[in-house]
């Protein structure tokens, strides 16, 4: 089934994007940067595992098509991810290379060691996970977040 909001096996878009109330508030910036997370988020698909060579090749292809930022992976996850990211950052791409990191200083250090331009930092905020798995309070989350962001900015 094809219509103006959906093309089978190709793409879909919410019709709500074209609602008058949405369009009235729409203020597009003059410059948009494309941040691609294929190399990290794509590996979270069941059955998908990129080898180092795959990651480097995909990063080069993303750069060729003009992607501004490539989220190349999470170097704290494995030695192979770390090596792939080092190779990607050293390969002279025009794109900025970002790392994904938990809100841990060690993860930030790995991103810096790889030569990344920037880092996407995550911290869990789901209540059951915070309370039951980590034993954290909301204040702990805020404190850890602020401390990690300050640390990353210094690096």
Identify the residue ranges that each predicted region occupies.
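An N-cap/entry alpha-helix motif that binds or orients negatively charged groups
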Residues: 1-23
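Alpha-helix-loop-beta-strand connector modules within alpha/beta enzyme cores
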Residues: 18, 78-102, 140-155
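N-terminal small/glycine-rich loop or linker at the start of catalytic domains
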Residues: 23-48, 120-134
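Hydrophobic faces of well-ordered beta-strands that scaffold small-molecule active sites
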Residues: 33-37, 68-72, 95-101, 117-121
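Non-membrane alpha-helical structural segments and their capping/turn regions in soluble enzymes
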Residues: 49-56, 82, 135-146
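Catalytic domains of carbohydrate-active enzymes, especially glycoside hydrolases
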Residues: 54-73, 110-118
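Glycine-rich, proline-tolerant flexible connector loops at the mouths of alpha/beta enzymes
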Residues: 67-93, 123-136
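Hydrophobic, small-residue-rich alpha-helical packing segments that form membrane-like cores
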Residues: 105-155
């Amino acid at each position: 089934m094809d219509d103006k909001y959906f093309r089978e096996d190709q793409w879909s878009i919410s019709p709500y994007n074209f609602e008058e109330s949405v369009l009235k508030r729409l203020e597009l910036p003059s410059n948009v940067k494309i941040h691609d997370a294929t190399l990290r988020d794509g590996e979270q698909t069941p059955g998908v595992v990129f080898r180092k060579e795959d990651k480097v090749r995909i990063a080069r292809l993303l750069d060729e098509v003009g992607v501004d930022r490539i989220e190349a992976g999470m170097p704290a996850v494995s030695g192979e991810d770390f090596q792939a990211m080092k190779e990607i950052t050293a390969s002279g791409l025009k794109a900025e290379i970002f790392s994904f990191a938990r809100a841990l200083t060690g993860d930030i250090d790995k991103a810096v060691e790889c030569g990344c331009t920037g880092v996407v930092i995550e911290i869990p905020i789901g209540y059951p996970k915070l309370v039951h798995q980590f034993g954290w309070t909301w204040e702990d989350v805020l404190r850890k977040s602020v401390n990690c962001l300050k640390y990353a900015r210094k690096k």
